[in-house]
Amino acid sequence: MGRLILEHTLQGHKGRIWGVAWHPKGNVFASCGEDKAIRIWSLTGNTWSTKTILSDGHKRTIREIRWSPCGQYLASASFDATTAIWSKSSGEFECNATLEGHENEVKSVSWSRSGGLLATCSRDKSVWIWEVAGDDEFECAAVLNPHTQDVKRVVWHPTKDVLASASYDNTIKMFAEEPIDNDWDCTATLTSHTSTVWGIDFDADGERLVSCSDDTTIKIWKAYHPGNTAGVATPEQQTVWKCVCTVSGQHSRAIYDVSWCKLTGLIATACGDDGIRIFKETSDSKPDEPTFEQITAEEGAHDQDVNSVQWNPVVAGQLISCSDDGTIKIWKVSE
């Protein structure tokens, strides 16, 4: 069994911290929260410290932040119904664009693999796709309304322009652009959770997705493409996503976030029971019937709800978490 070793505990935000995001280089991260501020942290020697505080972009809580794949831009989603785009053009971070259109709180933001598309979602039940049109110019490419409730999370596929969204309506939906008419369509609806789906993340090649829910389970979904060897039917030549594994019994409350490490294959969860848990695929796991085991759990990782977890994209086994308790923690998993 593995261990979760606490390396750093960081404070600075006032109130609850909603989100953390690693820079693509892994030596910088951003955090956001109830205090309407974004903090940029960097590592000097063995010490993490706040290098920049961005406090003039939003009027309400900042729910989520994400770096662009190139690392030049930072997007922040806020309860003030806007998404801000920040860049460090003149040595200092500044807000270059504010994306407006959602009617209510923006809950999540995600950059596509190329950095050419941005997705946002909101309590207004919609998912928006924005095209990066040039220097600080963003154009709305699609407004998608297949969800019947608040949309909690959007995440782009790691290798294709395919978007996944998770909602209070208990479903996950997939979106792709029609090659003929260039319209964005919902291509799949994933149903198995019995309550709100809070978080989703793809594995390294995007052939599987992990989801976490208010129903206290995590689920593994697998993509079956037209002509698949398993004989899974694919109506209208669309990829079908099937739930191939449900992991239950480890979490006692809602699971608010899940992160699938692209380097190690480990899965981390952030839970409303103040815990962080790490799961690993078993050695005898089958492709169409995978099995996962919990390798370690930090039951009291934080003093209150854990809101977000994210694996470092460069440093294998390093995990960051944040919580309602106002702290950020950096952990190392030893298997």
From Swiss-Prot:
WD repeats lie at residues 12-51, 57-96, 101-140, 146-185, 192-231, 250-289, 301-335. InterPro entries: CIAO1/Cia1 (IPR028608), G-protein_beta_WD-40_rep (IPR020472), WD40/YVTN_repeat-like_dom_sf (IPR015943), WD40_repeat_CS (IPR019775), WD40_repeat_dom_sf (IPR036322), WD40_rpt (IPR001680). It comes from the Eukaryota. SUPFAM superfamilies: WD40 repeat-like (SSF50978). Pfam families: WD40. Essential component of the cytosolic iron-sulfur (Fe/S) protein assembly machinery. Required for the maturation of extramitochondrial Fe/S proteins. It comes from Drosophila simulans. Keywords: Repeat, WD repeat. CDD domains: WD40 (cd00200). The gene is Ciao1. This is Probable cytosolic iron-sulfur protein assembly protein Ciao1. GO terms for biological process: iron-sulfur cluster assembly; protein maturation. GO terms for cellular component: cytosolic [4Fe-4S] assembly targeting complex; metallochaperone complex. Belongs to the WD repeat CIA1 family.
